Regions:
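Extended, hydrophilic extramembrane loops/domains of integral membrane proteins
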Residues: 2-31
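Short juxtamembrane and helix-loop transition motifs at transmembrane-helix boundaries
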Residues: 15-25, 40-52, 71-79, 178
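Transmembrane alpha-helical segments that form the functional core of multipass membrane systems
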Residues: 39, 50-143, 147-160
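Hydrophobic alpha-helical transmembrane segments of membrane transport and translocation systems
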Residues: 46, 201, 213-281
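Hydrophobic alpha-helical transmembrane segments of multipass membrane transporters and ion channels
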Residues: 62, 116-121, 154, 158, ...
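Juxtamembrane helix-boundary/capping and inter-helix hinge elements in multi-pass membrane proteins
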Residues: 104, 179-189
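Short helical (or helix-break) motifs at transmembrane helix termini and adjacent helical loops
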Residues: 161-179
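Pore- and gate-forming transmembrane helices of large, multi-pass membrane proteins
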Residues: 167, 185-222
Length: 281
């Protein structure tokens, strides 16, 4: 079928007439993707309304900004890719919170807690990889790249934890705000204990989402290789080792959101209280 493709009725195909002779290019497969994208946008707008619209705007801005930085790296290879992705990580977090709450209402606690969690997990992961000399990691699936594939993989580690970390930070800090608002007399110990209970519920589910999101992309290849007689351990190393590392790095980022959220919440609360005291004096 690779040399003589078989078509069914109602299949859409792409043709080329540049040589004044119609030639088959490939099947047109983007129709289903378009339907899914439109359905997703419609659901977001229908369920979340105005906030959903601004969330989509934030996603669009983040995608455009990422492509812009990658274009810069493509035009000038002397600029370090990891530096560009580090800049993108910070800006993407600010854009995400800004489109949700408005640029004038950006919550510095959430921004700083997310940045702290993502970069801390990234540094721990990269240091561990360096100490172990990347043992057990198989880069075969990305060796076709025309640039240092390890650098590209490290960049993907940094990007992988942004969304999940930001979600967890928003949930924890917003919950703590509600607790303080409804129970002003609550002390720090009780606040932290309540925050831990909230975090324990959200963190596990976030890590599970991250796990299945990463592993699902490699599962078809994993099954295909096993069906063709490959050894299970060898197949696992080749197709899942990098995904497992991404899950671990993202999982660490999610876990670090718990102490970082408490840290910046209590720090800003203390600064706010101190500011009010100074005003009274």
């Amino acid at each position: 079928e690779s040399t003589n493709p078989v078509f069914n009725k109602n299949n859409q195909i792409l043709l080329d007439n540049s040589t004044k002779k119609w030639e088959f290019i490939s099947l047109k497969r983007d129709g289903y993707t378009f339907i899914l994208v439109v359905s997703f946008i419609s659901l977001v707008l229908g369920i979340a309304g105005k906030k959903g619209f601004f969330s989509l705007v934030g996603i669009l801005f983040n995608i455009i900004f990422l492509f812009f930085l990658l274009w810069i790296n493509q035009r000038n290879r002397s600029i370090n890719l990891l530096l560009l992705i580090s800049i993108y990580t910070i800006i993407a977090i600010i854009i995400s919170t800004g489109t949700l709450y408005g640029l004038k209402k950006i919550d510095l606690r959430k921004v700083l807690a997310t940045i702290f969690s993502v970069f801390l997990s990234y540094f721990i992961t990269t240091i561990t990889m360096k100490l172990l000399n990347d043992q057990g990691l198989r880069y075969e699936e990305i060796q076709f790249l025309t640039r240092p594939y390890r650098t590209v993989f490290l960049a993907s580690l940094m990007l992988g934890g942004i969304g999940a970390a930001l979600d967890n930070v928003v949930v924890i800090i917003s919950s703590l705000d509600e607790l303080v608002r409804h129970t002003p007399e609550i002390n720090t110990k009780e606040l932290i204990e309540s925050g831990k209970n909230i975090a324990s519920d959200t963190t596990t589910s976030m890590i599970n989402v991250l796990l299945f999101a990463y592993l699902s992309s490699a599962t078809p290849f994993f099954i295909f290789y096993l069906a063709n007689g490959w050894d299970f351990v060898e197949t696992f190393k080749m197709h899942l080792s990098l995904e497992i590392m991404r899950v671990l790095c993202g999982g660490l980022a999610i876990l670090f959101t718990i102490p970082s959220s408490f840290l910046f919440f209590l720090l800003f609360k203390k600064l706010k209280k101190k500011g009010k005291t100074d005003e009274c004096n």
